[in-house]
Amino acid sequence: MAQSTEARSQAPRLGAWAEGSSVRWRVWAPGHKGVDVVLYDAEDRVLRKVPLTPEADGCFGGALPDLAEGTRYKLSVDGGDPFPDPWSRSQPQGVHGPSEVVGSDHGWTDSHWKGPDPQALVIYEVHVGTATPEGTFEAFIPKLAHLRELGVNTLELLPVASFPGARNWGYDGVDLFAPQATYGGPRGLRRLIDAAHAHGIAVLIDAVYNHFGPDGNYLRAYSPHYFTGKHHTPWGDAVNYDSEGSRFVRSLVLSNVEMWIRDYHADGLRLDAAHAIVDDGQPHLLAEIVERAHAASASGRRVVVIAEDERNERKLVTPASEGGYGLDGVWADDLHHQLRRAFAGDHEGYYQDYTGSAEDLAATLRQGWFYTGQKSRNLGHARGTDPKGLGPWHFVHCIQNHDQVGNRPFGNRLSEDVSPAAYRAMSTLLLMSPFTPLLFMGQEWNARTPFLYFTDHNAELGKLVTEGRRKEFAGFSRFKGEEVPDPQARDTFTRSTLDWGELDNAEAAGVHTLYKELLRLRATEPVLTSRQGTHDARALGPDAFVLERRAEGDTLLIVVNLKGSLMHTLNPRASAGIVMWSENPRYGGTVAASPLTGNVLHLDGPSAAVVKLRE
């Protein structure tokens, strides 16, 4: 039976926190007889064990005097082995080590910060561990100036909650409240976010609420109610959001949302695989996450919540007042898939659902996503809803992201599969469209370093992960005869480290110039910045299409040629002026002369041009 809104909204404070010269604990362990706090010294030696007092709702609590922040501890349930606190705010020695009492103090300098405009985001996705050689929050701070000069206004961090070992994408997290120690822990994350705000850059946290990782997951030691057999996910039993005991499980998530926004000054969240967050109750957890995120922000500071969701479901971004969940955006990967089919020829797996034709690309651009209810051959059932009436900023588009690169067996960047000319054309379309663009780190110079799938699990689990990874790609014809890199090998991780030195070579510098100029145009051209603008798209024969953007009485045409030669005559009643073309030598192309002669546009091979019309 669904719980009431009132019951669900109560957020019990759990974990450990300092109160004056004491530390207070509160632990949820329903059905158990007792919970002890086990205190440790700096060398992991047990100092003493102190029982907590039973409280209501299956909780145990108590305060210990003469303790402060920095206290390290584990929890023992019914006299069993001590385990980390599932509500721990810090795990300095990893997910199996003692938890640490930490506060939220930081000398914040961002009182001026008002948060991001959800209709004007340019997102840059970063994996902290491979974004710099050091792989820490603070090591990325010097790169913020690069992002600001590029034209990025939003930094999206792959999950930073504590995960097993030192090498992981972050989606195996188990301690939601504890920023990864090898990244720099709570202090490093606060410094990065504060510095980002000083550069005018918002920070989104990638949050994983659809499952918990297996390594270091001690939740069942405290309560079986963290999970439910009522629903199942690709990772096993679902997290319990709608059955017995779910109030405290929901509180785990909602308190985590509050923490990122309030204690770390994060500007919002990217919700991983929201389609796998199963909740049959009312209100849906996704709606509560949005509500809680906004409530946690400082007065006047905007926050955004974006979901990764494969369903093409308009309800996600429909306002709560109209029966939706009220998210600001949703990942819409159909454009990525159409472009890869068109330029790289991908056709296996979910790519079988796409043609990459000019007509289908135009339809995707008109709608925001391609599937609006038609049957998916890959899934075997209908997919998608009609997006009519939704603002284009709700759709997050990309030509690369961590999934689309890292879930290829060799972590190949787009540069490995399409020509430099095609890369420039795809980039031009992405950044000139009315949708929210997402860039994957290094994309702005066409980085050549791979982004592989890597882990650092215990030996037994690691062996299973390695075997599973290789079986996953065994059925793909293009990968037969090649051995997929071992996720557990350190070299798999180090090979994925971004090489910022690539910016010094001429080809990379050309692409970087293209991205900077496109993003400057996106931020300054009235046709692109207008909130009253409209857009349309249509095919120009089998191998080309045009995206039209109209506002302020002007029209901007983004013409993309897939292959062959295009001769396109523009409206003879309008004056036409070339704004930019992707094959300009300044971007690494080979076409020095303008492709526009009078009102005739001539493009050869994969390329794109931006033309302004004025009647």
Positions of PLM-derived features:
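Substrate-binding/active-site clefts of carbohydrate-active enzymes
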Residues: S111-P118, H127-G300, V304, K315-L316
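Generic enzyme active-site microenvironment
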Residues: I123, L204, R270, I306-A307, ...
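Conserved alpha/beta catalytic core and glycan-binding cleft of carbohydrate-active enzymes
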Residues: L286, V290-R478, I558
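Short, flexible loop/turn elements at secondary-structure junctions
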Residues: A56, D66, H127-T132, A161, ...
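Beta-sheet entry/capping signal
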Residues: R26, N153-T154, G200-A202, D267-G268, ...
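Carbohydrate-interacting/catalytic domains
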Residues: M1-Y124, P133, E138-G151, F410-N412, ...
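Extended hydrophobic-aromatic, low-complexity segments
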Residues: L219, R250-S251, Y264, R408, ...
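A glycine-rich, aromatic-flanked flexible loop/lid motif
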Residues: E258, R262-H265, F395-N401, E483-T492
